[in-house]
């Protein structure tokens, strides 16, 4: 005869393999705080509705508080034989308060219980991630203000394209992080409905108040359909999708740091705080933190793909497949959290090699577009013609092995006789970046204005809490 809480109709004990594949406590133990909070709200509602006595609800609440303290202090023994966090808590509650513990599960199933727990858990993840990204943004903005005039090469195809400022480059990631935060905030809005009280799938015949438990747990409202409440994990998928996009942004920045710190490039330097050495090569300083951020992106994307595959073929309502929704997601969330904190640390630590940046910004004829723009503005030349003329001049400079501003004026005039000495003034990298004053451009005054606006915005967010 089975000794499981669900074992009334079973005559044989589960096979050892069945026990092993069915157990989830190693993963869902991380939901203990959410499980206890939901159970306390449920018990209070049951008492308010006259379904259980006020005394039983009081004892249940005290017992749950004791369990919360025990787990927090590391004094709670999780038992694999009890399968999951729900039964581990309920079993210990019975030890503490006796038969009244059995009343807690009235008008509730593990199906709506775990859906509620996991929504609460993911909601906490969303709030923590938003706060971490705000710190990341602040670090970027502060460094951008510091380097609003630090000239560096801008790239396309990993080839020198046009001069930009280091501050402008950093502010690009502020904007990406803002969209990431927006996606997380949007996901939170859709997540914030309570499944509690949906029971197994069809609701319950008890006169429960789902609005009361939803309010108690900080949800906006109860979910409107009991089948939907226990069947879907789209709130996890949406959060993992936003997390994957965020991780890709971090990975791109990490990739740049890896490239820039290479001695062959040498645009930036990381301190010993964010580098490691080699066990055989004494000279090495490896950008391992950036490399690991890049790698952890795979963990986040993998978690999304894994859960999509779990969910894709499941008919309504709950299926045991959905027990596999947590481990990958939790690992993905943890990987993203660590990546954000690591990138925040590297942003604060990174030192731009300003002389090298300035020199690199002038390589590859990066101010060629400025010459083409001068031809358009001064000679009223159509841009396509100006592009063609400038291309020929770049070809002459490349053939002579000189920078664009080093090419003699007479050789430029051999291509276009109307070019005057005034054109040479636009060929410096400083002139180039200062001229990019269009909204969103790299001009230092733009970068400062944007960064200051972001600082005010972040400070306002912090005050509002």
UniProtKB/Swiss-Prot annotation:
Location(s), subcellular: Cytoplasm
InterPro entries: Arg_succ_lyase_C, Argininosuccinate_lyase, Fumarase/histidase_N, Fumarate_lyase_CS, Fumarate_lyase_fam, Fumarate_lyase_N, L-Aspartase-like
One cellular-component annotation, GO: cytosol
PROSITE patterns: FUMARATE_LYASES (PS00163)
Signal peptide start and end residues: none
EC number: 4.3.2.1
GO molecular function: argininosuccinate lyase activity
GO BP terms in the entry: arginine biosynthetic process via ornithine; L-arginine biosynthetic process
Keywords associated with the record: Amino-acid biosynthesis, Arginine biosynthesis, Cytoplasm, Lyase
Pathway: Amino-acid biosynthesis; L-arginine biosynthesis; L-arginine from L-ornithine and carbamoyl phosphate: step 3/3
Pfam families (UniProt xref): ASL_C2, Lyase_1
Family membership: Belongs to the lyase 1 family. Argininosuccinate lyase subfamily.
Name of the molecule in the record: Argininosuccinate lyase
Organism of derivation: Rhodopseudomonas palustris (strain BisB5)
Lineage: Bacteria, Pseudomonadati, Pseudomonadota, Alphaproteobacteria, Hyphomicrobiales
